[in-house]
Amino acid sequence: METLTAGWVLPVTAPPLRDGRVAIEGGRVVWVGRGGDPDEPEAPVRRLGAGVLLPGLVNAHCHLELSHLAGQIPREGGFVAWVEALVATRGNVSENGIIDRAEAAIRALEEHGTVAVGDVSNTLVHLDLLWKSRLAAVVFLELLAWDSARAEATLEWAETRLAAVQGSLGPDLEVRLAAHAPHSVSPALLLRLRGRGGPAAVHLAESREESRFLVSGDGPWAEFLERRGQGHLAFAPPGVSPVRYLETLDVLHPRLVAAHCVQVDAEDRRVLARHGVHVVLCPRSNRNLLGETADAPALAAAGVPLALGTDSLASVETLDVLDDAVELHRRFPQLEPEGILRMATAGGAAALGLADLGAIAPGKRATLAYAPAEAVPDEPHRFLLSGEARLERVGAA
């Protein structure tokens, strides 16, 4: 057993503790309190300093296999132009190059206080890296097939791929089937995924182009499909928002992780809340690609469960979800700092179904993060969201 001390301990699911202490044993938290509490266990003390100890962060939406695209994709031409450039560029590197950059990204995550990821992959080429890492990972094997005739074959390929990697999985590494987005996956494939209890994740209501295509069937996304040789495929636009379209297909459920949700209205928010969908906000990526971000205060007020993610290095500078927490605080100063940090910890753990992460409490895993400080901060949450704090991983290996 060992006791960690810090200027502040932020359990997240309980009030913050000035001069807090956390006792850990066997990789688990066994006690949380203050020095001198009568029930404090006897154990050697490791004094971290004047800074802030908190649960390790959860990056609930990233794309590790796109890490080789850092700085490669122009962002100035709008969302569809960015997608088109990404599609054209992502294959211009060897598999070893993809793996090398993914490995570097995983190391950076580990070093800076992230303990779990919701990672979207089309290939699973880096699965072995995650197995060897210190991260808990839920990997979403993402399916794309706009042609309804390919739905069955696409799902068969995915199930074969899942069966092939079962021996590489474990308690800290899981693979679930996901759909890319409502405007890139055919209704036939979405319904087949529903038949398997999914999809487990989706990009949802990210861009205005997506919304326009589903309402009217035209616009920049329809033109993109035409350039891709898929403009001839029959599609009757549902005439509703992306959120309500997925509701009509009965694929919204409490285990669904929906990234972005920028283009949503009040009724969409009520739908998401009613179905218990976990929405992962990616404020830096949305800012960079769209010039706007999801209305986090309105989503929170509607009762939508919220988490934070970074998206990929093709659209942001780092995979540090603390940077997204800082951006969300800058964009929406009316949000309580405690709530933003909850999104980056407990919210992400809940979205990914990682019940033993996201908080400092007895029984939880002692995979923690520490932000050093020269003096004990007056307001620990605001200190973490100042843009000056940097995290390091502490606690259990």
Where are the predicted features?
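N-terminal metal-binding scaffold of metallo-dependent hydrolase/deaminase domains
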Residues: M1-E40
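Histidine-centered catalytic micro-motifs
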Residues: P55-S67, P199-R208
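Active-site gating loops and adjacent loop-to-helix segments of metal-dependent hydrolytic enzymes
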Residues: H68-D100, R134, V138-L144, R208-R255, ...
